[in-house]
Swiss-Prot record:
Protein name, UniProt field: Voltage-gated inwardly rectifying potassium channel KCNH3
Subcellular location: Cell membrane
Basic residues composition-biased segments: 776-788
Gene designation: Kcnh3
Assembly, per entry: The potassium channel is probably composed of a homo- or heterotetrameric complex of pore-forming alpha subunits that can associate with modulating beta subunits. Interacts with KCNE1 and KCNE3; these interactions regulate KCNH3 trafficking to the plasma membrane and its subsequent voltage-gated potassium channel activity.
Transmembrane domains' residue ranges: 229-249, 260-280, 303-323, 332-352, 362-382, 483-503
Length: 1087
């Protein structure tokens, strides 16, 4: 398995630090969120606190960290206020008070509130520790329970206040002195810290940076990699020179001293000594995959692993010889121990084994090194055969055979007294070291091949034996040589398979797991390179892959267990997930139920900074934290901190329900989790229904944090849409580009009906509500359901006639006060700014009076009324309620602006429509003078529809309360002001019964298309449509046409309607019929 780099991602180890540092007396603590002012909810609760108070973790979470649920009648009110003040001011506080367990038993508690800051220096958490000091208080007698809190007033006696206060003060002093005396054996330095007021360092709630000394080397850093390269070269040098110097040495006497060492030998020994020093300052990877930076742990780990081997390999034989210390050949053989350093190179070289060229190079180097060792041994065997031969001149060894072929035979000479020889052939291998004594006869063996020829011949034999069976030119003759040749051939067969057969099945089986790791790593790197993944995301991907590989070693357990039978697979799953199945939540489950649940459990892994669950995600599993710590966030606020043994998720929903997460869950450290899939959980509970109620009840108490609170989407209830008076709720969405989300569909051109009914039609109640600007509408109901249409509008299932449709949003531009008002009425509906033909506007047309329009059309798509989009099912959540409140507020502001604009418009019209005296009124054809004061009255009403303009035409002969003169002979009747202001049409038809027409001046509309009466029969002809449209002068209508409709004469009685000054609509006067309304004059205006 390749050496891992270790997990170097920065982690938030706050929870682990608290658990290890605050043990013993400080293990009973809770953590409160200091960012939620006023409540300071508990985000973590230790097991010791639960054991002390009797409350479970689920009962303590999200309560106030002041732990007011532990208060009782004897709890001091003053201490309560001081605790609250310390929390509000983010200050440290310590006090003694009486608290009560869940069972009701009181106990004395030493409470300590410690604020904890984050990386920004802000107080993020409160550490509230609780220490039970009841035993200390009980030593003073039973009256000590009554000295504080409510008992102080309950049992106090008059005149004893000073005595009780002194006694309490003395006991407090004794208690603190006893505490200091107990701490004295721990060391004087701690006492000095207490005297000078130095406080213990508290951990901060932040991502812990990698803190290491500058003298600590990272095992995978560039500096350490460079140093390892030098050590690799030195080790290879030792692997080559040590066997050669031991086997090819020509020293014959044990007392002979070695020659001076070379510079390379001295440099290698210095490097080995320095490597020992650096190994004491180099990080390592622990069994859990974490990188250890502590110097003490590093030293302990090195001493127990490679220290002894490195010390033996670094014995300075050459340095001792350099300092004139006599080192013999026997001691020099200990240098062969340095070859064991090659074992240390294997893990370091294994990280490069994923590259084929590197693997081939390393294998060839190993093969050549092995051949060098075999050659050295083969040379040593041949020389020993010559020295130990019984004859004076042995001739059966491979060295004698080589000497005869090279014509450099061996010969014997007598040893001289000074140890020299008379031949002087120092270049031969037998004479280079001074020769050797033959059989102890005083003769010395000299001659033979040179040392270079002998080594090359040995290396040739070694390679031929390792790669094949040899060629026979260099063969084994003696028994010793034959035995070594056999061993060499066996080693050669194995090495041949390893080196030259690495693509075969044997090599693949040997490196199957390694190849799988490298192939997946290579695929991952190729994917990153092809898709140009950014560097931070690339690092996260590699970290996650390496961390998960370290956990499961690349084994796909799901695929592996699929081939096993269900019975065996269930037993294996119960063994793997026994930590989760031993929770109290599953105590009542039968063995069969546990086996079914174990098959639904899946392992999961989360790295630091990774989000396990995002807010709004559909919850699909329950998660049990096996190791590590996580935090629950919502809008950057920490809601809970989860550690080992915590269960997160939601309450058991129905199968059809989808639960959305109400917060984010992020890993602080490397976390190993077990997730229970909700789908598998439902299937298991369906098989064992007797366990389902117990599991549902127990799950509420076991959840450390409920992620599904308020996140269940309810089913649709369409029965709420059946009422006639039910209005659909609308939601105004704010678009960033400023475009309207919904528009109003116009009425089709071939429809006889329109949103504004003709005078002959009877308005329905729903249409009247839509037409009145100040209608009183019921409060819209949330959660309306319907079928969505393609236009983004939900059609109610109860039918189109059941619900009137309104605008999606109403927006009014502000009206400036310093410019003349536009007296032409406009329909302000929030979409009037669009002037293209694709924008839908209101269509005001007067339909044909008659029985065919006696009833108003139902509000729907065909009638052209406004469409109300239905709110989707998620409108019941909190976000939708906030948006709806905002939309209602904005709509109210726009309605107020519209009311102010209408009042200004009404005042301006009242100033224009004042009573006029007798005067000449111009004809429609434009002949004759016209008073300037009448120009404003002659302007027709214009309604902007985006397509064509419409003008209002009064009937001929109608007068305005007798103020206008009667028509003279030969002249057309004068034009009257056709519009006063009256009550809204919500109490009656939209327009009184009159013969006025809405006629279009557009060229595209044929003449008379919008008229209800025939063409005028008087000699005076109206101006052409183009002139009328340009000048804005309405066409005249004859008296005959006015009376041909069968309308009663003006002045007939009618019912009066209530006046609404805030709701103004345009109506026609002067042509009252029997069924029309008799309008009353307003005092002071003549209208």
């Amino acid at each position: 398995m390749p050496a891992m780099r270790g997990l170097l991602a920065p982690q938030n180890t706050f929870l682990d630090t608290i658990a290890t540092r605050f043990d013993g007396t400080h293990s009973n603590f809770v953590l409160g969120n200091a960012q939620v002012a006023g409540l300071f909810p508990v985000v973590y609760c230790s097991d010791g606190f639960c054991d002390l108070t009797g409350f479970s973790r689920a009962e303590v979470m999200q309560r106030g960290c002041a732990c007011s649920f532990l208060y009782g009648p004897d709890t001091s009110e003053l201490v309560r206020q001081q605790i609250r003040k310390a929390l509000d001011e983010h200050k440290e506080f310590k006090a003694e008070l009486i608290l009560y367990r869940k069972s009701g038993l009181p106990f004395w508690c030493l409470l300590d509130v410690i604020p904890i800051k984050n990386e920004k220096g802000e107080v993020a958490l409160f550490l509230v520790s609780h220490k039970d000091i009841s035993e200390t208080k009980n030593r003073g007698g039973p009256d000590n329970w009554k000295e504080r809190g409510g008992g102080r007033r309950r049992y106090g006696r008059a005149g004893s206040k000073g005595f009780n206060a002194n006694r309490r003060r003395s006991r407090a002093v004794l208690y603190h002195l006893s505490g200091h005396l107990q701490k004295q054996p721990k060391g004087k330095h701690k006492l000095n810290k207490g005297v000078f007021g130095e406080k213990p360092n508290l951990p901060e709630y932040k991502v812990a940076a990698i803190r290491k000394s500058p003298f600590i080397l990272l095992h995978c850093g560039a500096l350490r990699a460079t140093w390892d390269g030098f050590i690799l070269l030195a080790t290879l040098y030792v692997a080559v020179t040590v066997p050669y110097s031991v086997c090819v040495s020509t020293a014959r006497e044990p007392s002979a001293a070695r020659g001076p060492p070379s510079v390379c030998d001295l440099a290698v020994e210095v490097l080995f000594i320095l490597d020992i020093v650096l190994n004491f300052r180099t990080t390592f990877v622990s069994k859990s995959g974490q990188v250890v930076f502590a110097p003490k742990s590093i030293c302990l780990h090195y001493v127990t692993t490679w220290f002894l081997l490195d010390v033996i390999a670094a014995l300075p034989f050459d340095l001792l010889h350099a300092f004139k210390v006599n080192v013999y050949v026997g001691a020099h053989l200990l240098k062969t121990v340095r070859l064991l350093r090659l074992l240390r190179l294997l893990p370091r070289l294994d990280r490069y084994s994923q590259y084929s060229a590197v693997v081939l190079t390393l294998l060839m180097a190993v093969f050549a090194l092995l051949a060098h060792w075999v050659a050295c041994v083969w040379f040593y065997i041949g020389q020993q055969e010559i020295e130990n031969s019984e004859s004076e001149l042995p001739e059966i060894g491979w060295l004698q055979e080589l000497a005869r072929r090279l014509e450099t035979p061996y010969y014997l000479v007598s040893r001289s007294p000074d140890g020299g020889n008379s031949s002087g052939q120092s270049e031969n291998c037998s004479s280079s070291g001074g020769g050797s004594e033959a059989n102890g006869t005083g003769l010395e063996l000299l001659g033979g091949p040179s040392l270079r020829s002998a080594y090359i011949t040995s290396l040739y034999f070694a390679l031929s034996s390792l790669t094949s069976v040899g060629f026979g030119n260099v063969s084994a003759n003696t028994d010793t040589e034959k035995i070594f040749s056999i061993c060499t051939m066996l080693i050669g067969a194995l090495m041949h398979a390893v080196v030259f057969g690495n693509v075969t099945a044997i090599i693949q089986r040997m490196y199957a797991r390694r190849f799988l790791y490298h192939s997946r790593t290579r695929d991952l790197r190729d994917y990153i390179r092809i898709h140009r993944i950014p560097k931070p995301l690339k690092q996260r991907m590699l970290e996650y892959f390496q961390a998960t590989w370290a956990v499961n070693n690349g084994i796909d357990t799901t695929e592996l267990l699929q081939s096993l039978p269900d019975e065996l697979r269930a037993d294996i799953a119960m063994h793997l997930h026994k930590e989760v199945l031993q929770l109290p939540l599953f105590e009542a489950a039968s063995r069969g139920c546990l086996r079914a649940l174990s098959l639904a459990l899946r392992p999961a892994f989360c790295t630091p900074g990774e989000y396990l669950i995002h807010q709004g995600d559909a919850l699909q599993a329950l998660y049990f934290v096996c190791s590590g710590s996580m935090e629950v966030l919502k809008g950057g606020t920490v809601l809970a901190i989860l550690g080992k043994g915590d269960l997160i998720g939601c309450e058991l929903p129905q199968r059809e329900q989808v639960v959305k997460a109400n917060a984010d869950v992020k890993g602080l450290t490397y976390c190993v989790l077990q997730c229970l899939q909700l789908a598998g959980l439902h299937e298991s509970l369906a098989l064992y229904p007797e366990f389902a109620p117990r599991f549902s009840r127990g799950l509420r108490g076991e959840l450390s944090y409920n992620l599904g609170a308020g996140g269940v989407s309810a089913e649709v209830d369409t029965s709420s849409l059946s009422g006639d008076n039910t209005l659909m709720s609308t939601l105004e969405e704010k678009e960033t580009d400023g475009e309207q989300g919904h528009t109003i569909s116009p009425a089709p051109a071939d429809e006889p009906s329109s949103p504004l009914l003709s005078p002959g039609c009877t308005s329905s109640s729903s249409a009247a509500k839509l037409l009145s600007p100040r209608r009183t509408a019921p409060r819209p109901r949330l959660g309306g359901r319907g079928r969505p249409s393609r236009a983004g509008v939900l059609k109610p299932e109860a039918g189109p006639s059941a619900h009137p449709r309104t605008l999606d949003g109403l927006q009014l531009p502000p009206m400036p006060w310093n410019v003349p008002p536009d007296l032409s009425p406009r329909v302000v509906d929030g979409i009037e700014d669009g002037c293209g033909s694709d924008q839908h506007k209101f269509s005001f047309r007067v339909g044909q009076s008659g029985p065919e329009c006696s009833s108003s059309p139902s509000p729907g798509t065909e009638s052209g009324l406004l469409t109300v989009p239905l709110v989707p099912s998620e409108a019941r959540n909190t976000d939708t309620l906030d948006k709806l409140r905002q939309a209602v507020t904005e709509l109210s502001e726009q309605v107020l602006q519209m009311r102010e604009g209408l009042q200004s418009l009404r005042q301006a019209v009242q100033l224009i429509l004042v009573p006029q005296g007798e005067g000449q009124c111009p004809r429609v054809s434009g002949e004759g003078p016209c008073p300037a004061t009448a120009s404003g009255l002659l302007q027709p009403l214009r309604v902007d529809t985006g397509a064509s303009s419409y003008c209002l035409q009064p009937p001929a002969g109608s007068v305005l309360s007798g103020t206008w003169p009667h028509p003279r002979p030969g002249h057309p009747p004068p034009l009257m002001a056709p519009w006063p202001w009256g009550p809204p049409a919500s109490q009656s038809s939209p327009w009184p019964r009159a013969t006025a027409l809405w006629t279009s001046t557009s060229d595209s509309e044929p003449p008379g298309s919008g008229d209800l009466c025939s063409e005028p029969s008087t000699p005076a002809s109206p101006p052409p449509p183009e002139e009328g449209a340009r000048t804005g002068t309405p066409a005249p209508v004859s008296q005959a046409e006015a009376t041909s409709t069968g309308e009663p004469p003006p002045g007939s009685g009618g019912r009066a309607l209530p006046w609404d000054p805030h709701s103004l609509e345009m109506v026609l006067i002067g042509c009252h019929g029997p069924g029309s309304v008799q309008w009353t004059q307003e005092e002071g205006t003549g209208v």
